[in-house]
Structure formats: C-alpha cells, structure tokens
Design a protein with these regions (language model features):
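Sec-dependent bacterial lipoprotein signal peptides
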Residues: 1-17
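OB-fold and OB-like single-stranded nucleic-acid-recognition modules
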Residues: 4, 18-209
Length: 209
C-alpha cells in the first residue's frame, strides 16, 4: 500500500507541474506552425497586380481636376477609395503627362513639381521622389488587398512601407529624378485628398518622354 501511494503521488506531481518546453526567440513558428510575416515578400508577390490595378482605375488628371472644381473630396463616390471602408481618408488613382518645373531634394521627402498637360488650374501638382514617401495612398487605393488580409496594424503599415521601397527602386530611381527638370513625363499614381491646393502623388509608373 505504501508503494502504491508513492506511485500515485509521483504521478500526481507530474500532472500538476506539467511539461514545459522552452522556445527560443525567433523559433516560435517551429512550434506553432505559423510563418512569420515578411512584408518584402508579400509586396514582391503582389507588385505587378497592384500596378495593373492602379493603372486600370486611374482617371485622367485634367478630367479629374475639372470635375472636382476645387473640391477634391467631392469625387469620393465616383473615383475615390476610403481608407476604412466607408470612412477615413480618401485616395484616388490618376494619370497624366506634363513638364517637370522643379526637382526639390532639400529634404528627405523630395518631390517634383509638374505642370500638367491640358490643365491650367491653380492646384500644385507634386510627385514624390523620396527617399522618404509620405502617406499611404498607394496601399489604400488598391482593390486587391485590405486590412482584413493581415494580422495586425504592424503588418498593414509594413505593406505600405514596402510598397514605397518598391516604388523608390523600380519607378523613381530608375527614372533618375535629378535629371528631369524641364523634361516631359507621363505618370500613373495615387494621392490622398488632404486639401484642395496641392496634390502629392506617389507614382507607380513614370516615363520620360
């Protein structure tokens, strides 16, 4: 009886304390089976589809500005996409051509000022040239992804950052922005309607004529 009691007690102790497995930081996926999110791989996989999506919905910039009549948010239902379903910031996809009046790289958030062909309105048209890119209009304009495709806000933000990295490498630097002053360009891009005086466009396609 004493031996049986000892065996039972030992078994109870094992069940009570359980078995603890130490998992090293960075090796969690081996235990859980969950693959760590890689924003660079994610964006590389959707990049060409993303460009096609934006190019397919882009509105001619002169047409857009004329229809807006000085109120960029007024075309939200016709051309825009909200950042949060039916609310939040409004982003648009546009395309056009024009002459580069100025290339400004005094700050890291560089830009070009473009005089668009076919439009003489007061709005200032800027195209971002990096190295820092403001906003998230490229991501927010896309119809092929949304926040629900990602686990958390960190992943969603990382997608926007990687889109900007891809744009900087494949689109902007490939066009050698420092050499573009006075030249004619064509572009496809996105912008968020933050005001009515200025459009800050993030290009997904930029060609020098």
């Amino acid at each position: 009886k004493k031996l049986l009691a000892l065996v039972v007690a030992a078994g109870f102790a094992v069940l009570s304390t359980g078995c603890v497995k130490i998992v090293k930081i960075g090796e969690e996926s081996a235990l859980t089976g969950k693959v760590e999110f890689n924003a660079s791989d994610s964006v590389s996989g959707l990049w060409e589809e993303a460009r096609a999506n934006i190019e397919g919905k882009a509105v001619d910039l002169p047409v857009f500005l004329q229809e807006a009549g000085g109120d960029l948010k007024s075309l939200a239902d016709k051309y825009g996409k909200y950042s949060m379903g039916t609310s939040g910031s409004i982003s648009y996809a546009v395309k056009g051509s024009g002459t580069v009046l100025e290339v400004n790289q005094e700050k890291k958030a560089g830009f070009m000022i473009v005089k668009p062909d076919g439009y003489d309105g007061p709005e200032i048209i800027k195209i971002q040239i990096g190295s820092i890119y403001k906003g998230s209009s490229t991501r927010d304009t896309l119809d092929i992804i949304d926040y629900g495709n990602y686990t958390n806000q960190e992943e969603w933000a990382a997608v926007s950052q990687e889109l900007h990295s891809k744009i900087d490498t494949d689109v902007i630097q490939a066009a050698d922005p420092t050499s573009l002053s006075g030249k004619t360009i064509t572009f496809v891009g996105t912008f968020t309607a933050d005001g009515n005086d200025e459009l800050l466009i993030t290009a997904v396609d930029l060609e020098v004529q």
